[in-house]
Structure formats: C-alpha cells, structure tokens
Amino acid sequence: QRQEEPCATGPCCRRCKFKRAGKVCRVARGDWNNDYCTGKSCDCPRNPWNG
C-alpha cells in the first residue's frame, strides 16, 4: 500500500480508496438495519440503531 492510498482492503474500500459515505456495506437482516460506509474508513461500522 502506497502512502497516498487510504486503504487496501475492506468492505468500504474500492480501488484503494474509501467508498463514499452512505454506501451500504452490510445489508439488513431480520430486525437489523443496513450498515453504511462513513467515507473515512475501510471498515463497515455497525448501525447504532441495531442495538
């Protein structure tokens, strides 16, 4: 990973760049809501409304 590349892998990373904020990174299941990328991380944070 080069210095100017923010990420290499992860559900919110595409072509070594963060996916835009609001992009679904984990689809809702059962009573849980969708989880969304923040635009600042390669990780997929849990939706706070999911408990």
From Swiss-Prot:
Location within or outside the cell: Secreted
Cysteine disulfide links: 7-16, 12-37, 13-42, 25-44
InterPro entries: Disintegrin_CS, Disintegrin_dom, Disintegrin_dom_sf
Task performed by this protein: Inhibits fibrinogen interaction with platelets. Acts by binding to alpha-IIb/beta-3 (ITGA2B/ITGB3) on the platelet surface and inhibits aggregation induced by ADP, thrombin, platelet-activating factor and collagen.
Residues carrying Pyrrolidone carboxylic acid: 1
UniProt short sequence motif Cell attachment site, positions renumbered to this chain: 29-31
GO cellular component: extracellular region
Keyword Metal-binding: no
The keyword ATP-binding is annotated on this UniProt entry: no
Other observations noted: The disintegrin belongs to the short disintegrin subfamily.
Identification of the protein by name: Disintegrin eristicophin
Predominant cellular place of this UniProt entry's protein: secreted
Subunit structure: Monomer (disintegrin).
Keywords (A to Z) from UniProt: Cell adhesion impairing toxin, Disulfide bond, Hemostasis impairing toxin, Platelet aggregation inhibiting toxin, Pyrrolidone carboxylic acid, Secreted, Toxin
Tissue spec: Expressed by the venom gland.
Species, as recorded: Eristicophis macmahoni (Leaf-nosed viper)
